[in-house]
Amino acid sequence: ITASSVDELEWKCAEMKKLLLSQDMDVQPCSFCQEQAFLSSLPLVSLERSLFERSKRNVLTLGAASCYPFTSYEMCDDNGILLGVNKHNNSLIIVDIFDSRVYKNANIAILGTSGAGKSFSMQLMATRMRRKGIQVFIVAPLKGHEFHRACSNIGGEFIQISPASQNCINVMAIRKVDRSVDEMLDGPGVEKSLLAAKIQRLHIFFSLLIPDMNHEERQLLDDALIRTYARLGITHDNSTLDDPDHPGQYRTMPVLGDLYEVLKESPDTKRLANILNRLVNGSARTFNQQTNVSLDNKYTVLDISELTGDLLTVGMFVALDFVWDKAKENRTEEKAIFIDECWQLIGANSNRLAAEFVLEIFKIIRGYGG
């Protein structure tokens, strides 16, 4: 405080004391103590006793913490799974992605360079979720063998889909889904044609199999699909799905071979039939049979790494479609779908319809406990 006279200086000091006292701050004069104050500010761990007595105050721990110039970040959810150790402060990273109080949804994207450990991190999360009782599905389009040992050791189901495998998922099957939980929670819903929904997804399948299919061929394919199901007594009326000889079960579903026979009948769909012949009578005829695998196991791996070229994205879609039907059965149970190498379906050169299907799962799986 400076002034041009002693009286002015005393007045300014008095006003300053009033101002500080109004803000609950005590003021003590430290005349001729500049040297001691300077030495106390140096990192000498030395504080003048008289200055300490005048300047000391009691501070709550919360206030003292605010003076600490560092912040320690950590993720430690109450009921999560251990992912690793924070390399910055050595704290454990424990995450519960299903905790809606902390996270808006449970979706996770694992990104990294080649060899960074993306597949390992995914498998680590999957096995630890399984130990917590969460149902896990893994779709492995590449390096499926990496998941086999862990799957076997925890009693999981390893399903290999390839031309040389005996496992098969009938892409044309309309699968019976238990909707009792949905009806209990929401009441009876509006009945929708299951055949129409299935044909819509089959259009995605054939757009992956035949990328250059034009609009006319899509319409002809749509008519052929409806006629194929009609020959087995299945129409847009959902009651026609029930098997009269086996109550509570669906009818025997058509396979690709049935559609192939319908496509051969018209010269306009001859090209589609010729392309489909590979999956019916050719090297990939393993797709032309009824479904012989189950997804009831709590830890299921679908290995499609033996499929190459255009069949890889086709097989990936078939596996994902199968898993998605199973995941929608009971939305009160927690479940996780892991898609390794997801860029195969949503990358820049991928099929638009397939990418939209993956996006749909990504957006609404939260409503089904995933």
Predicted regions and their residues:
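Post-Walker A helix-loop "phosphate-sensing" segment adjacent to the P-loop in P-loop NTPases
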Residues: 127-137, 154-156
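A generic structural motif
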Residues: 1-9, 113-116, 305-308
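Short, hydrophobic/aromatic alpha-helical segments in well-folded domains
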Residues: 12-16, 106-109, 121-126, 146, ...
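Conserved ASCE P-loop ATPase motor domains encompassing nucleic-acid-directed helicases/translocases
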Residues: 1-37
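Short hydrophobic/aromatic beta-strand immediately N-terminal to the Walker A/P-loop
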Residues: 107-109, 137, 301
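Active-site-adjacent "gating/activation" loops or surface patches in catalytic cores
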Residues: 69-125
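P-loop NTPase motor domains
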Residues: 25-26, 36-93, 143-144, 150-156, ...
